[in-house]
Amino acid sequence: MKTQRDGHSLGGWSLMLLLLGLLMPLAIVAQVLSYKEAVLRAIDGINQRSSDANLYRLLDLDPRPTMDGDPDTPKPVSFTVKETVCPRTTQQSPEDCDFKKDGLVKRCVGTVTLNQARDSFDISCDKDNRRFASLGNFFRKARKKIGEEFKRIVQRIKDFLQHLIPRTEA
C-alpha cells in the first residue's frame, strides 16, 4: 500500500509541475508594460534625473506607432510633459500633482522597452517651442491677409478716382 500512495504522490507532484510550467509563460506576459505605462516609467526616470525644482507630468502622448510584438525591442515614443506644482523631493506620484500655471513644457522623444524586467528607456526632452512656431504662423497669415486687404482698398480708390475724372471725348 505504501507504494501505491507514493505513486499517487509522485503523480500529484507531476501534475503540480505541469501546471506550474503552463503558468510560467503567463507570469512572464504579465510583466509586459502597456505603451502608456512604459512612457510613465520613463517620465519617472526623467523626474529622478532632472535638476529642475518640480516634477513633470504627462501632458500629451502621441499615438502609438505600429510595433512588433517583442517587448525587448526598443519602441519609439514621443510625448509632452509639463511642470507640476509638486517639488521634486516629494514622494508623491506626478499623476497626483496639478500642473503649474505657466509651467515649463518639454517635448520628449526617444525609445522605451515594454519588458518590465528590463525597464530601459532612452529619452531626451527639450523646451517645447511649438507655441512660438504657432505664433510665427499667426503673424505670417495676418500679414498676408492685411496685404490682400490693402491691395483691395488701393484698387477701390483707383476705381473711384477713375469715375471722378471727366472723360474727354475725342
UniProtKB/Swiss-Prot annotation:
Major localization class: secreted
Region annotation Active core: where it falls in the sequence: 150-162
Propeptide: 31-131
Keywords: Antibiotic, Antimicrobial, Cleavage on pair of basic residues, Disulfide bond, Immunity, Innate immunity, Secreted, Signal
Pfam entry (one): Cathelicidins
Domain of life: Eukaryota
Post-translational modification: Proteolytically cleaved by proteinase PRTN3 into antibacterial peptide LL-37. Proteolytically cleaved by cathepsin CTSG and neutrophil elastase ELANE.
One Gene Ontology biological process: defense response to Gram-negative bacterium
Protein's cellular compartments: Secreted; Vesicle
A single GO cellular-component term on record: extracellular space
InterPro entries documented for this protein: Cathelicidin-like, Cathelicidin_CS, Cathlecidin_C, Cystatin_sf
Signal sequence residues: 1-30
PROSITE patterns for this protein: CATHELICIDINS_1 (PS00946), CATHELICIDINS_2 (PS00947)
Alphabetized Gene3D superfamilies for the sequence: 3.10.450.10
Disulphide connectivity of cysteines: C86-C97, C108-C125
GO molecular function: lipopolysaccharide binding
Function: Antimicrobial protein that is an integral component of the innate immune system. Binds to bacterial lipopolysaccharides (LPS). Acts via neutrophil N-formyl peptide receptors to enhance the release of CXCL2. Postsecretory processing generates multiple cathelicidin antimicrobial peptides with various lengths which act as a topical antimicrobial defense in sweat on skin. The unprocessed precursor form, cathelicidin antimicrobial peptide, inhibits the growth of Gram-negative E.coli and E.aerogenes with efficiencies comparable to that of the mature peptide LL-37 (in vitro).
Domain remark from Swiss-Prot or TrEMBL: The cathelin-like domain (CLD), which is the propeptide part, does not seem to exhibit auto-inhibitory function, as it does not inhibit the antibacterial activity of antibacterial peptide LL-37.
Stated family: Belongs to the cathelicidin family.
Name listed for the protein in its UniProt record: Cathelicidin antimicrobial peptide
